[in-house]
């Protein structure tokens, strides 16, 4: 007796298990992981989304909640499991998992605890998707990108930190607000370490090719009567303010990560400020990861743009590199 499905649907091609073309995995289904997931789904970037976490109930609930939105999405398969076999054949894996900083905890201690988490996660990712590109989002992102690179054994063009992509987006938004234009028409770069010691490249800030520093030579300095330096200060403080107000940040970082993924999956060769291995650049001698303008395409992070930086900007980058190395050199089990 034929089933309803057999009566309804007459097959033309043989059924086969298909390997997904553009599978994306998100590791960690906390606020940031789920913001990444919904941003990826909203841009229709993937034909299969896999979620992984250690909290099974939360994981299943998030998966079901997204699956129930399938009618409104163009992603035919959404899966989740605590077992990493669910991530097999991923093109891109986004790592948002990690432990949170406790009150009064040193960064070194926080990093070491996250190293212990990553020692489990990273080998599993590489086991099931040996050809993937890994995007690290967990903080402190520059150090954990280095940790991921070391643990994964992947070439450096396939291990990328979300880095200053969000810092630069915040910078362009705040500048554009002051000027009354859209952020996409206000060009500016935040480089270096994601967060407190990031570097604003004032010499490169422009609108329609007009250098703003040529109009106001004091821009970004302490002598500036218009106090544009405050914009960079606001970029650095904005995450803390959002955390103070709502407890965490998630939407902007989720959108920022989807933006990076789009450049890679669509082979766009767009340029983003993301965290990459900078040894040998700007006189940096250690294996540290910092954000520089990088070309992202289907192969991963394929090139770095040589920006003309001023001496004090290079000095700031070197200082960040030294700070990061100071923590990295004491990490155990890498």
From Swiss-Prot:
Biological processes per GO annotation: lactate metabolic process; pyruvate metabolic process
Location(s) in or outside the cell: Cytoplasm; Mitochondrion inner membrane
Annotated organism of origin: Bos taurus (Bovine)
Protein name in the entry: L-lactate dehydrogenase B chain
PROSITE patterns: L_LDH
One of the record's GO molecular function terms: L-lactate dehydrogenase activity
Binding site for NAD(+): 53-58, 100, 139
Lineage per the UniProt record: Eukaryota, Metazoa, Chordata, Craniata, Vertebrata
Gene name for this UniProt entry: LDHB
Modified residues (Phosphotyrosine): 240
């Amino acid at each position: 007796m034929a089933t309803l499905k057999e009566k309804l649907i007459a097959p033309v091609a043989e059924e086969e298990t298909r390997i997904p073309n553009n599978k994306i995995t998100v590791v960690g289904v906390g606020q940031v992981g789920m913001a990444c997931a919904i941003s990826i789904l909203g841009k229709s970037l993937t034909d299969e989304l896999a979620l992984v976490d250690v909290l099974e109930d939360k994981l299943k609930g998030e998966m079901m909640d997204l699956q129930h939105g399938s009618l409104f999405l163009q992603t035919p398969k959404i899966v989740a499991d605590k077992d990493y076999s669910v991530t097999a054949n991923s093109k891109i894996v986004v790592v948002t998992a990690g432990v949170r900083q406790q009150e009064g905890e040193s960064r070194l201690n926080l990093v070491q605890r996250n190293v212990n988490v990553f020692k489990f996660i990273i080998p599993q990712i590489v086991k099931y998707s040996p050809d993937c590109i890994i995007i690290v989002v967990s903080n402190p992102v520059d150090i954990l990108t280095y940790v991921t690179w070391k643990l994964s054994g992947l070439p450096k063009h396939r291990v990328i930190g979300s880095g200053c992509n969000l810092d630069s987006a915040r910078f362009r938004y705040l500048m554009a607000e002051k000027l009354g234009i859209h952020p996409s028409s206000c060009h500016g770069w935040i480089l270096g370490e994601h967060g407190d010691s990031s570097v604003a490249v004032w010499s490169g800030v422009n609108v329609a090719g007009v250098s703003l520093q040529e109009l106001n030579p004091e821009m970004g300095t302490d002598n500036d009567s218009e106090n544009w330096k405050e914009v960079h200060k606001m970029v650095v403080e904005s995450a803390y303010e959002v955390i103070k107000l709502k407890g965490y940040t998630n939407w902007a970082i989720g959108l920022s990560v989807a933006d990076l993924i789009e450049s890679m999956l669509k082979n766009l060769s767009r340029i983003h400020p993301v965290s990459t291995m900078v040894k040998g650049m700007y006189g940096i001698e250690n294996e540290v990861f910092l954000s520089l303008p990088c070309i992202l395409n289907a192969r991963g992070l394929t090139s770095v743009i040589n920006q003309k930086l001023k001496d004090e900007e290079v000095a700031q980058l070197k200082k960040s590199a030294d700070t990061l190395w100071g923590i990295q050199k004491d990490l155990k089990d890498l």
